[in-house]
Amino acid sequence: MSIALKQVFNKDKTFRPKRKFEPGTQRFELHKRAQASLNSGVDLKAAVQLPSGEDQNDWVAVHVVDFFNRINLIYGTICEFCTERTCPVMSGGPKYEYRWQDDLKYKKPTALPAPQYMNLLMDWIEVQINNEDIFPTCVGVPFPKNFLQICKKILCRLFRVFVHVYIHHFDRVIVMGAEAHVNTCYKHFYYFVTEMNLIDRKELEPLKEMTSRMCH
């Protein structure tokens, strides 16, 4: 990453604190392998494939945490331009509106301003990935039976952040010189969720044209 991009994606801009893996553990090694996929020249399509002999849940877990860290960093770089005035409803253009629902305050799908939606989303994901019953950090502790379903929901909602950033705020990304980095993050995300079949194709529709040009 260039010096300019490092300044754009600095730790002060992180929307949420990073969740990390313990050095020396199997998941830390998988995390390093996943991280290496952002190095220039790496074949992202090949990099996301489950390594031989590795557990699928471990592979998905390290990627979900990694994508959460990266995407909240991307949103953090433009969040000052994403306000209740500029984005009164969380959307991806005129055709796609995303409503928030959880098991707490919002029992029914509710239209919210984009920044409020993003805050609720990042809070919700943080709770999931910091829950030892869902994302166990101790080696040998099994993942729950519904682990992949939870991950699918997390990734589906993270994809909506990409949709909103690309459609409503990509001009700011370009001004900051971060276009190449964001595009690489998106390609990595797209190749992973399609390789592992973690997002319904209908959810990917808002960026379909862009994706067809970017991800061959």
Curated annotation (Swiss-Prot):
The keyword Hydrolase does not apply. Zn(2+) binds at residues 82, 87, 164, 169. One of its GO terms (biological process) is signal transduction. One of its GO terms (cellular component) is nucleus. InterPro entries: MOB_kinase_act_fam, MOB_kinase_act_sf. GO terms for molecular function: metal ion binding; protein kinase activator activity. Gene3D superfamilies: MOB kinase activator (1.20.140.30). Keywords: Metal-binding, Zinc. It holds the Pfam family Mob1_phocein. The keyword Transport does not apply. Belongs to the MOB1/phocein family. Modulates LATS1 expression in the Hippo signaling pathway which plays a pivotal role in organ size control and tumor suppression by restricting proliferation and promoting apoptosis. PANTHER family: MPS ONE BINDER KINASE ACTIVATOR-LIKE MOB. This is MOB kinase activator 3B. The gene is MOB3B.
